[in-house]
Amino acid sequence: MRIQVINPNTSEAMTHKIGLAAQAIARPGTQILACSPDDGPLSIEGHFDEAIATLGVLEEIRKGREQQVDAHIIACFGDPGLLAAREYASAPVIGIAEAAFHMASLISTRFAVVTTLTRTRIIAEHLLQRYGLSELCTSVRCIDLPVLALEESGPELIECMAEQARRARDDEGAGAIVLGCGGMADLGRQLSEAIGLPVIDGVAAAVKLAESLVDLGLTTSKHGDLADPIGKPFKGRFAYLSR
């Protein structure tokens, strides 16, 4: 089985980290193909970044189709371009936020999210609403740290995340914590040990869900809005998409 893991930003260090985390959780025989776009933002921290990154995600999906991968994962917590990617791809496409939310709902009646910048809280809340899981999330908590700062993780970072997670646990009754950034993919075990709660990393959750969908022979339904894109002419830099 070959799973394409797309880091939608252009940080090579983060792509490497995400790829290692994905391969570590994958079962024997599953090959992880970690990649990122050639063009786009170095980190994704808002709607503008997501809009630009979506074009890169779709280009990587195109490459994955040519490589005939068995599944695609979008490894950014905003799930940028997820529905467009499902429309474009023939193999299953999983976003790490959606994967993490659903995984958390299976092991706890209430969960909280610990993410990076405060401005991304609303984006996470919008995703929870879209996926129908808002009522299960006690809060989206932020550590006010830029995404790229996660590349230099240490004890201070874990303690900062643990402080927010403990508040969600003690004040709100959260029974599980969702990591709100693909760049946190290597921090789940340390945080879980620090707070005594299950911690769900979306990259790991997405890999296991992708393996399960492939095993079950399931992929995106092409009935309705996720049917293949309607053929039409494209101009300029997108002319290659014409059909």
Predicted regions and their residues:
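Active-site rim beta-loop-alpha module in soluble metabolic enzymes
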Residues: 122-181, 187
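N-terminal beta-loop-helix "entrance" segment that forms/cooperates
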Residues: 33-58, 148-153
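Short, flexible loop segments at boundaries between secondary-structure elements
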Residues: 145, 200-219
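Short, well-structured alpha-helical segments in soluble
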Residues: 51-68, 159-173
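N-terminal beta1-alpha1 ligand-phosphate binding loop
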Residues: 2-25
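Periplasmic-binding protein-like
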Residues: 5, 66-76, 173-181
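Short, acidic/small-residue loops that bind anionic groups at enzyme active sites
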Residues: 86-108, 190-207
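Short, glycine-/small-residue-rich phosphate/pyrophosphate-handling segment
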Residues: 13, 105-142, 156-159, 212-243
